[in-house]
Amino acid sequence: MARMVQCIKLNKEAEGLDFPPLPGELGKKIWQSVSKEAWAGWLKHQTMLINENRLNMADARARQYLLKQTEKYFFGEGADQAQGYVPPQS
């Protein structure tokens, strides 16, 4: 049976992640309160941030930036948007 969590991002009960996606306290916090669906949304957003900002993941500053954005995306006021990005109309 799948592990269910009350997803902090989607505000509903949904299937939880199989394991903490990051090391440390942030990974544990995400594992406890973020669903697979919300994590998949973050991965898409993270990819957009990496591409649009031309982040070099070998650079420690870029990795720190993404960790801060991860925390803001789930537990803060929301992550940065890529400059010039316009969300599709639904």
Curated annotation (Swiss-Prot):
Origin organism lineage: Bacteria, Pseudomonadati, Pseudomonadota, Betaproteobacteria, Burkholderiales
Organism: Cupriavidus necator (strain ATCC 17699 / DSM 428 / KCTC 22496 / NCIMB 10442 / H16 / Stanier 337)
Gene Ontology biological-process annotations: cellular response to oxidative stress
Molecular function terms, GO-annotated: iron ion binding
A Pfam family hit: Iron_traffic
Protein name per the record: Probable Fe(2+)-trafficking protein
Function: Could be a mediator in iron transactions between iron acquisition and iron-requiring processes, such as synthesis and/or repair of Fe-S clusters in biosynthetic enzymes.
Keywords for this protein: Iron
PANTHER family linked to this entry: FE(2+)-TRAFFICKING PROTEIN-RELATED (PTHR36965:SF1)
